[in-house]
Amino acid sequence: MKISFIPFVSVLLALLYGCTAEKKPESVSELFPVPISLSCSAESFVPEDSLAVVEGLVCSGRNLVVYDLQSGESYVLFDALSGEYITRFGRIGQGPGEISSGSYGCLSDGRFVVFDDATKNVTAYDMDTLRNGARHGGFVWRQRYDIGDGQLSRLAFLGNGLFFGAGLLDSHYQYILFDSDNHIHDTAVEVYNSEDTSFDRYTRFLSNQGDLVMNCSGKRLACALNFSSNIDFLAVDEGKIRLVKSLRLKNPLYLPESSGGIYSASVTPESFWGYISLCSTDKYVYALYSDKKVMESGRCSSTVLVYDWDGNPVRSFQLDVPAFHIAADETDSHLFVSLMDEEHNWKISVYDLK
């Protein structure tokens, strides 16, 4: 009797492959070790009557800037060491040194640089000038940019006249590197839905919003998409964008709509929060993250994930209360978070990381 060993060998190889093949994680949280529980060390770090509606935090050195539109101004500056209130700045308007509402930016080297894609303006404020009580609100320079039909949701000033933008370029690319003369040095990384014909250029841009952070050298950046498990780690080398690592476990779920010149990208019942807020230091990228569905919870989380700049998971923290935004100090010693108390008042609390 002739016996064939080929089917048996094939089955054996299949079983061995099934045992050794790396299983794709269902959640970002599975990439990290057991979270470290943290308890708040300073529940009300800044004066409680100094905040209205917090929409973001950034920290660098001794400067803690809170996005908080109040009395016609966009931001409030606190001392990151003591919590002392210093001043409000970023007046809303169209005059010299004034900006549009909802302008986001990056804080580094004592400068807070914000942008508005509708007006194509980039505006810079000097933190030392603000601390010295300048009458002109710390405004130091402004310039316009022109990248054709490209649209930006976030912008970082890298220094030496270079800007890094995240958004949508040529209905295809997610990132752009350009200079103050509007010369485009590079574009990189295809957006997740570039081939999805249910999206046009406007709804595709709306479905690729997210958060962007950089390290102090301006050479490393990280960008995460809203309502997703997608985060990219990038480097800028000799005028080129290099994708260091891309962790794309679950794309956003959007319903694109357009009618009468009005465009929207709405979340679905299956959409989840994913990456909520990013912040960074020279060593790490911190990410506020939630696996919960949008319809089941608010846009907050008690889970903070920590990556190194190569995109490797390092550790995770579990806060004792849900946070809306986060910012780490440059020594990786403290984490500032925005919280809402039982009376729906905003406050900034601090967690010790060491």
Question: Where is each model-derived feature located?
Answer:
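C-terminal motif of bacterial Sec signal peptides marking the signal peptidase cleavage site
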Residues: 16-18
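Beta-strand-rich domains and repeat architectures in extracellular enzymes and scaffolds
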Residues: 44-74, 276-277, 284-291
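Bacterial signal peptide processing site
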Residues: 20-23
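Surface-exposed loop and turn segments in beta-propeller and other repeat-based domains
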Residues: 35-47, 87-98, 137-148, 185-207, ...
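Loop/turn-rich, solvent-exposed surfaces of beta-rich toroidal or solenoidal domains
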Residues: 268-306
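Beta-propeller blade signature
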Residues: 175-180, 300-311, 350-353
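Asp-box/WD-like beta-propeller blade repeats and closely related beta-sheet repeat scaffolds
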Residues: 127-159, 166
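Structural signature of eukaryotic scaffold interfaces centered on beta-propeller domains
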Residues: 55-58, 103-107, 153-159, 204-217, ...
